[in-house]
Every structure is written in C-alpha cells, then in structure tokens.
UniProtKB/Swiss-Prot annotation:
EC code: 2.8.1.8
Reported cofactor(s): [4Fe-4S] cluster
Span list, region Disordered: 1-25
Gene name as annotated: lipA
HAMAP family named among the record's database cross-references: Lipoyl_synth
Name this protein carries in UniProt: Lipoyl synthase
Catalysis: reaction(s): [[Fe-S] cluster scaffold protein carrying a second [4Fe-4S](2+) cluster] + N(6)-octanoyl-L-lysyl-[protein] + 2 oxidized [2Fe-2S]-[ferredoxin] + 2 S-adenosyl-L-methionine + 4 H(+) = [[Fe-S] cluster scaffold protein] + N(6)-[(R)-dihydrolipoyl]-L-lysyl-[protein] + 4 Fe(3+) + 2 hydrogen sulfide + 2 5'-deoxyadenosine + 2 L-methionine + 2 reduced [2Fe-2S]-[ferredoxin]
Source species taxonomy: Bacteria, Pseudomonadati, Pseudomonadota, Alphaproteobacteria, Hyphomicrobiales
Length: 323
C-alpha cells in the first residue's frame, strides 16, 4: 500500500527525529535474499507516481524505501495519512517525523475524499500520526474523513488504522460510530518490548481498545499487526495471539521489522519465511478469520483483496455454525 501525506508547506529542514539525534549508531544487518525486491519500473507504478505528483502529495513509502512500493503503486493502491506528518510519539521503530505538530487542515477530509474518487479506489486505508496534543486525539477528524469519503465515493470500502487514543475519553466511541468497514490498531510488538520499542503506549490499553470496538459494534471487522525481529521470543508472539483472540480480533498481520536508520532500534534478527508460515498456521488454529504472515507483510499490504477474503471467511464461518 502507498502511504500518502498531504503536505501544504515545503520541508523546513528540521531534524526528523530530534529525540534520537544523541543516540549512538546501531549496526545495520545485511538483508537476506528473501527481503530483497526489484526496483519499481512498471507502467502502473509510473502512472501512480504521476498521479501522486499531480495531487501535490508526498509519500512516506518513497522516503522510507518501502519494499512493497513497486507492487502497490502498480495496482494504484493508496493509504492516506491524515492529521499532518509530525507525530507526538517517538517510537523506536518508526521513521515518521516527531515533534510539535501543526494545526489540523480543515480542508483535508474533502481533499482526501476527492483523491479517493479521482483515483477510483475500491478500498482505501486511512491512517494517521499520533496527536496527543488534541483533546480527542483526532477522533473528530477521522470521523469527518470517513463521512467525506462516503459522500464522494459511496462504493469505496474504508479501513482505518488508528492510534491508541490513550487518555482520550469518548474518542474511540466517536470513530466506531462513523462506521468504517475495518478497524485496525497495530500492537506493533510483544509486551516485553514496549518500554524500549513503543514507550509512549500501553500494551493492555491497545488490547482493550480492540476489544471495545467489538463491544460497540460486533459486526465491525477488527485487525491488528506486529513486527518480528525486535528480540521477541516465540512464546511471546503466541501469547500475543491469545490476547488478541480474547479481544475477538478477526485479522492478524505479521511482518519483518526493517530498520529505517542507524538511530532506530536495531534488527535483532531476520525471521525466516518458514517461521512466518509457522506463525500463520498457529494463528489460524487459534481462530483468526484471516492471517497474513511473511517477511514483507505490512498492515495495509493487499488490504483491498484481504478485505474481500475476510468477508468471505466470515460468511463461511457463519454458515458452518448454522449447520
């Protein structure tokens, strides 16, 4: 998937990660063969690139060197990142800029909806930076974007990938009430890594958030993803699966962590394709409707196709239960 940022001002040459500037460089491991991909050159990729340029948008995929950019852009898939490009958190794995964000762009919901319509998207993913500076964590903005897309492109299915709305009472309820088709909130890693990898978040708050979505709307699909290769143990990953199933999460994604810069958390190891397949098999036995587990899996990768499969798998499960 393409992660797109709507920028209204040019870069101000600010330090992208000021909180990491003082840290020593970490070792960058050589990527194994199963991680490497060909440089994007297809006609579809070039057309998407021109489309993005014509909308005066900037892609995180380009800046971060996402390994899936060629495949996703060829298919004209898009994930829009809303509420600016500056995050109030400072996760050790993430390449999004950190600092004090700008004010919300009130035209953004309409602009995103217009782009969705013009690009002819059948399925769109909306994500955002964390906005701890806002009273509702950006819940109203998510709501407005969903409504705008529904009006501009009624046939488009909507998947949201949200922050955790930590200490924002009522925020989650507002977003769920806007009726996205899929609610995704990534756990990112196992609980033992949170203090070093995701220090601004709370593991069981995220589990509870996903559980609460199902309580508010039992028909809404829920989804979560993690990275591996951050030093986690296998038994920790299996326990995380159990925690997500306790929250009735439908869809789990597991992918390899790739280090953005030498200032970010190091890759402890590259998990083999065979291990990813093992995780997938185990996750299905635990009751997930959908599992995507591979080195290059990302939470929005193949999102449209996966949504169709997710619906079909639920229908099969309901039919089997009725027999």
């Amino acid at each position: 998937m393409v992660t797109i940022l709507d920028r209204t001002k040019p870069d101000d040459k600010r330090i992208r990660h000021p909180e990491k500037a003082h840290k020593p460089d970490t070792e960058v491991l050589r990527k194994p063969e199963w991680i490497r991909v060909k440089a994007p050159t297809s006609k579809g990729y070039q057309e998407t690139r021109e489309l993005v340029r014509s909308h005066k948008l900037v892609t995180v995929c380009e800046e971060a060197g996402c390994p899936n950019i060629g495949e996703c852009w060829e298919k004209k898939h898009a994930t829009f990142m809303i509420m600016g490009e500056i995050c109030t958190r400072a996760c050790a794995f993430c390449n999004v800029a950190t600092g004090k964000p700008n004010a919300l762009d009130r035209e953004e919901p309409a602009n995103v909806a217009k782009a969705v319509r013009q690009m002819g998207l059948s399925h769109v993913v909306i994500t955002s930076v964390d906005r701890d500076d806002l009273a509702d964590g950006g819940a109203e903005h998510f709501e407005q974007v969903i409504w705008a897309i529904r009006e501009a492109s009624p046939a488009t299915t909507i998947e949201i990938l949200t922050p955790d709305f930590l200490k924002k009472p009522g925020a989650l309820e507002r977003v769920v009430a806007a009726k996205p088709d899929v609610f995704n909130h990534n756990m990112e890693t196992v609980p033992g890594n949170y203090l070093t990898v995701r220090p601004g978040a709370r593991y069981f708050h995220s589990v509870r958030l996903l559980q609460r979505v199902k309580e508010l709307d039992p028909t809404m699909f829920t989804k979560s993803g993690i990275m591996v290769g951050l030093g986690e143990e296998r038994n920790e990953v299996l326990q995380l699966m159990d925690d997500l199933r306790t929250a009735d999460v439908d869809f789990l994604t597991i992918g390899q962590y790739l280090q953005p810069t030498r200032k970010h958390h190091k890759v402890e190891r590259f998990v083999t394709p065979e291990e990813f397949k093992s995780y997938e098999d185990i996750a299905y036995t635990k009751g997930f409707l959908m599992v995507a587990s591979s080195p290059l899996t990302r939470s929005s990768h193949h999102a449209g196709d996966d949504f169709a499969r997710l619906k079909a798998n639920r229908e099969k499960k309901l039919l089997a239960a009725a027999e």
